[in-house]
Amino acid sequence: MNNKLTALIFLGLLAIASCKWLNEKSIQNKIDEKIGKNFLGGMAKAVVHKLAKNEFMCVANIDMTKSCDTHCQKASGEKGYCHGTKCKCGVPLSY
């Protein structure tokens, strides 16, 4: 039960962070409070950091909000492709 509550809190913090209500540092401080400075806490903080760096909302090669494609159309006129969590203009996935 405690693991489910921790996961729910973590997902809630990620949702709030994506709305720009909180910044990465405050979420990582909450993780330290709730989970602690252990292996699981470090993993959770790494996920938060990776998602916070994600400027164009690319998740697992999927352009969730079409912001990658929109950015590339404005910048270079090419189609935008998500490579993991990175947006690349005019470079389709090769696998």
From Swiss-Prot:
Disulphide bond pairs: 58-82, 68-87, 72-89
Tissue localization of expression: Expressed by the venom gland.
UniProt-annotated location(s): Secreted
All copies of domain BetaSPN-type CS-alpha/beta, residue ranges: 55-95
Keyword Secreted attributed: yes
GO molecular function, one term: toxin activity
Keywords associated with the record: Antibiotic, Antimicrobial, Disulfide bond, Fungicide, Secreted, Signal, Toxin
UniProt keyword Disulfide bond, yes or no: yes
Signal peptide start and end residues: 1-19
Principal place of residence: secreted
An individual GO BP term: defense response to fungus
Gene Ontology cellular component terms for the protein in this record: extracellular region
Biological role: Has antimicrobial activity against yeasts and bacteria.
Family, similarity comment: Belongs to the long chain scorpion toxin family. Class 3 subfamily.
Name of the protein in question: Opiscorpine-4
Organism: Opistophthalmus carinatus (African yellow leg scorpion)
